[in-house]
Structures are given as structure tokens and as C-alpha cells.
């Protein structure tokens, strides 16, 4: 059955998901603050800043008016970086109160909040009143927007403690090239989605320094061990980390040049300064903020995360990237299961 869906956030992932939902037969309105971006989407059906050369469905409508996008929507999909998530959630909450609507909320945000280190679903549950929403579903997994745009085969996870809501999201998104599995482990799905960006920066740095496949494989594998340890410390199911929102998302993000976190790490490995990398990218590099969050959380929970600690020193204390990588190899020898 066709649903009326509001998609908040018109970056690469938000706009491509909105386009796919439109082609799945749903009535979709895409919201963005940027008037020029909305004009291009509505008249030229393009989004050149984020998806160069991709042409969007003529049935997809964009607007700068969030109330217009949300009015009558049974589903709200939020695809906003963590830094701006609360502001959008509060604006949405006020609109839902005014409209007396209670939609299903789905988010595809990957990261942890600065300072509080909260997961996206925690932020949304605080800022969108229970009377204004149904459950909150997490959509996560190995899914570059560029691949989904060309209808390359993709599989992701819809995670929610209420499996009926996860199954509803599953039906909304699934099609011949985009397969959705369900999971009830929101904590694991969100930690996997956020922390993999840290390891992707490290993987990019490894290659930027000139190391090859063995080094990259070692870093990704040991990085997964770190992600699992921290997630489990917060109550996640360890099995989630060998699924799509865990190892799946990690592999695609830490091995692909489409990953902005990998590209940022690669430039750091080549000797560029962090601020120059950020300026050059022109987009949010979630892994930079997530590194600090994970570093602080690991210290509070006394969880060993040596790769994260090394990258924290590079990103926030100015340590040389090559020195940090060398120190990882010089650590005391230990069991793989520790």
C-alpha cells in the first residue's frame, strides 16, 4: 500500500532514499533548508552538490517548508547529520503537535552526539514527544548512495525494539535491488553505524601512508573487535556486529573511495592537516566527531579501544599519523580474544 512519506534531509543519502521510495510507489516530499537545492530538484530533477549527474524521479517533490512536507505523512524519514539532528527533531515535534499527527519515525543518521555522546534514537526520543510519534526505527547497513542510485544490489537492516514497526519499514524500502532485514537490537545497529566511521578514517590513513592489503585487513578486523566491545558494554547483542549494520557497514565504509571518512583518512595519511581535509571535503565527516565520543565512552566504561585512542591522538592532540600507527604495532603482545 502506498504511504505518504516526508523525508527530512536532502544530502546524498536522504535524496537517494527519497527517490527510491518514490519509485517504490509512495507519495514522497523531500525537505531541505536550501532554496536553490529545492529549486533544482523540482525543475531540473538534479542535486549536483551531492549527486553529480544523477537524475531524480519527476514524481519526487521537494520543499523548504517542513510543515508542508510533513502534513498528512504517515511516515517521517530523518536523514540529518548528528550535529543538526536535535534542531530538526524539535522543529518536527512542534509541527506534529500543531497537526495532531503521530507518524512512524525512521532515521538513517550515523553518529553519536557531541558532548552527550548519545545515539540518534536517544536524541529523537527526547525531542519528539511520545504522543507525536509511533516507534523509532533505525535504517542502517552497507549502503553508499552512489550504488543505490544506480540500483546496485544493496542489503540493510531496519532495527526497532517493536518488530512490527521494523517490518513496516522493511516493506516500505524493499524492492528488487534493495533488500531490508529486521532486527530488534537498536543499540547494536546504532553503535555499528557510528563507530565504523572511526575505523574507516584509520583504513584510509593506512592506504594514504602507503600500506597495502594486509595492513588494511588487520586494521578493519581489529577495529570490528573494538566496535563490538564498546557496543556490548552498552547492552548491544554481540551478534549484531557480524551482521549488516556491523561488519557489513564497516567493510563498505573502510574500503571504498565513495566513503567520505575513508577519503578523509587517506588525506591525513598523505600528510594533510585535519582542518585542510575538512575544508577540502565540504561535507560532514562524522568519524571525526565520533572518534572523540567513542574515546570518552571507552574511558568511562573501561573498554580497550587502541585504534580509536590512536586516532583520537591524531585528530585532537596533533600526533603524527605515522607515529600513531607504528605505536599500534609496538603494543604489548596479547590474545586475539582480548
Curated annotation (Swiss-Prot):
Q: What does this protein do?
A: Catalyzes the reduction of the glycolytic intermediate dihydroxyacetone phosphate (DHAP) to sn-glycerol 3-phosphate (G3P), the key precursor for phospholipid synthesis.
Question: Hey, which pathway is this one from?
Answer: Membrane lipid metabolism; glycerophospholipid metabolism
Lipid biosynthesis: is it a keyword of this entry?
yes
Task: Name the GO terms of the biological process aspect.
Answer: carbohydrate metabolic process; glycerol-3-phosphate biosynthetic process; glycerol-3-phosphate catabolic process; glycerophospholipid metabolic process; phospholipid biosynthetic process
- Localized where? Cytoplasm
Q: What is this protein called?
A: Glycerol-3-phosphate dehydrogenase [NAD(P)+]
Which species is this UniProt entry from? Limosilactobacillus reuteri (strain DSM 20016)
Record-level GO cellular component terms: cytosol
Similarity comment text for this entry: Belongs to the NAD-dependent glycerol-3-phosphate dehydrogenase family.
Q: Where does sn-glycerol 3-phosphate bind?
A: 110, 141, 143, 196, 249, 259-261
List keywords of the entry alphabetically.
Cytoplasm, Lipid biosynthesis, Lipid metabolism, NAD, NADP, Nucleotide-binding, Oxidoreductase, Phospholipid biosynthesis, Phospholipid metabolism
Q: Name one GO molecular function term.
A: NAD binding
Amino acid at each position: 500500500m502506498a504511504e505518504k512519506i516526508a523525508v527530512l534531509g536532502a544530502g546524498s543519502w536522504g535524496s537517494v532514499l527519497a527517490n527510491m521510495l518514490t519509485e517504490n510507489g509512495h507519495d514522497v516530499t523531500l525537505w531541505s533548508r536550501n532554496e536553490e537545492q529545492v529549486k533544482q530538484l523540482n525543475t531540473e530533477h538534479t542535486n549536483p552538490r551531492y549527486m553529480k549527474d544523477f537524475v531524480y524521479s519527476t514524481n519526487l517533490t521537494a520543499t523548504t517548508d517542513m510543515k508542508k512536507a510533513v502534513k498528512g505523512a504517515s511516515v517521517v524519514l530523518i536523514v540529518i547529520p548528528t550535529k543538526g539532528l536535535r534542531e530538526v527533531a524539535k522543529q518536527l515535534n512542534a509541527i506534529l503537535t500543531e497537526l495532531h499527527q503521530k507518524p512512524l519515525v525512521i532515521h538513517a543518521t550515523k553518529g553519536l552526539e557531541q558532548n552527550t555522546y548519545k545515539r540518534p534514537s536517544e536524541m529523537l526520543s527526547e525531542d519528539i514527544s511520545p504522543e507525536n510519534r509511533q516507534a523509532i526505527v533505525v535504517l542502517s547497513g552497507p549502503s553508499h548512495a552512489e550504488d543505490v542510485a544506480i540500483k546496485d544490489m544493496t542489503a540493510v537492516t531496519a532495527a526497532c525494539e517493536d518488530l512490527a514497526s521494523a517490518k513496516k519499514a522493511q516493506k516500505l524500502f524493499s524492492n528488487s535491488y534493495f533488500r531490508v532485514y529486521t532486527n530488534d537490537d537498536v543499540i547494536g545497529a546504532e553503535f555499528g553505524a557510528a563507530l565504523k566511521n572511526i575505523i574507516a578514517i584509520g583504513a584510509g590513513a593506512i592506504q594514504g601512508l602507503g600500506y597495502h592489503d594486509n595492513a588494511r585487513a588487520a586494521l578493519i578486523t581489529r577495529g570490528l573487535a573494538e566496535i563490538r566491545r564498546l557496543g556490548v558494554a552498552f547492552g548491544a547483542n554481540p551478534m549484531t556486529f557480524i551482521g549488516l549494520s556491523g561488519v557489513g557497514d564497516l567493510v563498505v565504509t573502510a574500503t571504498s573511495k565513495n566513503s567520505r571518512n575513508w577519503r578523509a583518512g587517506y588525506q591525513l595519511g598523505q600528510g594533510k592537516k585535519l582542518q585542510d581535509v575538512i575544508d577540502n571535503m565540504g561535507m560532514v565527516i562524522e568519524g571525526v566527531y565520533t572518534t572523540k565520543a567513542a574515546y570518552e565512552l571507552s574511558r568511562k566504561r573501561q573498554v580497550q579501544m587502541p585504534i580509536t585512542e590512536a586516532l583520537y591522538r591524531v585528530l585532537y592532540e596533533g600526533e603524527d599519523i605515522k607515529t600513531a600507527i607504528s605505536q599500534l604495532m609496538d603494543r604489548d603482545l596479547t590474545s586475539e580474544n582480548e
